[in-house]
Amino acid sequence: QIRPGHYAMWTGRIYFLAKEGGFEQFIVLMTFAVQKPLCLVSALFAGLILSSCSSSQRQVEAPARLPAYSFVPGKTAVLHNGKAIPPRNAPVQVKRAIAAANSLVNKPYRMGGGHRKHYDTHYDCSGSTSFVLKEAGLLTSTRHSKLFLNYGQKGTGDWISVYAKDGHVFLVICGLRFDTSGSGRRGEGPRWRVDGRNTRNFLVRHPTGL
């Protein structure tokens, strides 16, 4: 039996079992010919595991609590009717990310939403995070929250930060938090939020160069 967060190898494929709250899904990480020598396949599998372990040792843990939004001229976005307005000097990719996030505001929450199709009627935390980064050209395929633990580079970004742990992920873009939780209301979908939130056990990553 495979537990969430673990790898497995059989029938010509290497799998990763991701968990999003109570939702579990196998993700194919690598395929290979069954006829390929077992020693070579085992070496590839071992290399994948070691790489994952090595990456996790270089992670940066988020502080125990993310502070509430604070306006900084030329650096932070501002909210207007629930939508974010980016600073004029923000990079194009950041503006695209904000526009993508704005398009999801008021979408309802559903576990697995945004995973089966890019433009969906409902989104969960990793579905909405993936949508925003993909629209900005900063991600090529939808990920579950666990897989964001190795996204981009470690630490907070100048413009975009990704806060991730096994079971949840959210973004901070230009000082505003884009999250599906944190308001205390169950079933609420992706929203811009200005209040602080508990980030204990989260790791923080950012897109390269941002």
Place the predicted regions along the sequence by residue.
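Short hydrophobic targeting helices and cationic amphipathic motifs
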Residues: 7, 16-17
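Bacterial N-terminal signal peptides that target proteins for export
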Residues: 30-41
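C-terminal motif of bacterial Sec signal peptides marking the signal peptidase cleavage site
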Residues: 51-52
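Post-signal peptide N-terminal segment of mature Sec-exported envelope proteins
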Residues: 56-92
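...with weaker cross-activation on analogous glycine-rich loops/strands in unrelated enzymes
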Residues: 87-98, 130, 136-210
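Active-site nucleophile-His-acid catalytic modules used for acyl/amide transfer and hydrolysis
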Residues: 103-122, 142
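Active-site nucleophilic cysteine motif
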Residues: 117-136
